[in-house]
């Protein structure tokens, strides 16, 4: 197995699992997947930040705002590894509810950059934005409800 395939075999299940956990109110898997050593950045669909001290509370607020997380899939667009850096570019589809609303699909276009730290891959950057009009409208409703 080449290095890129091994990287994907390691990070994709962890990415899926942390999204489902987050959308069930548990931010711990996401926090565990991320580096706590700056520089790190988040350009999120709902909030952006730089540095662990600013990023961590966003994960807590996101976890508090979701419920009924059901699934997460990735349609891979690109990925690679070079030395201690790796990246994943994908369409991320997850199903979850917010503030008592029934579950719905959120589709994001996501770029995630990893840094190898102590023999493990840690996220140092995530950029996510709505992929389609349905997801854009769902995120706008969350903003109007004061979720984020």
Indicate where each model-derived feature is located.
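A detector for short, charged/polar N-terminal pre-domain segments
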Residues: 1-7, 138
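A solvent-exposed, acidic/Ser-Thr-rich amphipathic alpha-helical stretch
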Residues: 6-9, 13, 27-82, 91, ...
């Amino acid at each position: 197995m080449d290095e890129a395939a091994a990287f994907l075999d390691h990070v994709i299940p962890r990415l899926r699992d942390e999204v489902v956990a987050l959308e069930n109110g548990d931010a711990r898997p996401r926090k565990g997947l991320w580096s706590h050593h700056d520089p790190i950045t988040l350009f999120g669909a709902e909030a952006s930040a730089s540095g662990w001290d600013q990023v961590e509370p966003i994960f807590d607020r996101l976890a508090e705002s979701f419920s009924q997380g059901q699934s997460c899939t990735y349609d891979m667009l690109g990925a690679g590894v070079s030395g201690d850096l790796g990246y994943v570019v994908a369409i991320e589809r997850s199903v979850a509810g917010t503030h008592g609303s029934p579950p719905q699909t959120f589709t994001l276009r996501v770029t995630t950059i990893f840094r190898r730290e102590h023999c493990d891959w840690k996220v140092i950057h995530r950029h996510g934005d709505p992929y389609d009009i349905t997801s854009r409208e769902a995120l706008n409703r969350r903003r109007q409800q004061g979720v984020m």
